[in-house]
Amino acid sequence: MFVLRTERNIKFHVFIAVVMIGMSLFFQITKVEWLILFLVIGGMFVIEIINTAIENVVDLVTEEYHPLAKTAKDVAASAALVFACISVIIGVILFGPYITIFLIGELP
């Protein structure tokens, strides 16, 4: 897949996704929590792929600097950043109770 080979951010997201899936297996999260987790992980990948597509199309259309080209790239990157922030919040809500209970010593 082109994005995995070329985009540093997607590699980071793959790493985080693997960590989150590992934590989910360890904490034995519920089916609903799995659904939420996969929606968030999938959403992040989709946003990053769209961001990459927009950046590449902008680069294809113009080799010169243009304020609208910069705006298009910045807006696409901002969408990825906003979704990443929302993903962190969801992760804290999802895993916070499990981590707290684990630190107290009540989980396996």
Language model: regions and residue ranges:
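Amphipathic, cytosolic membrane-interfacial segments at TM-TM junctions
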Residues: V58-V75
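Hydrophobic alpha-helical transmembrane segments
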Residues: F2-I50, V61, Y65, A80-P108
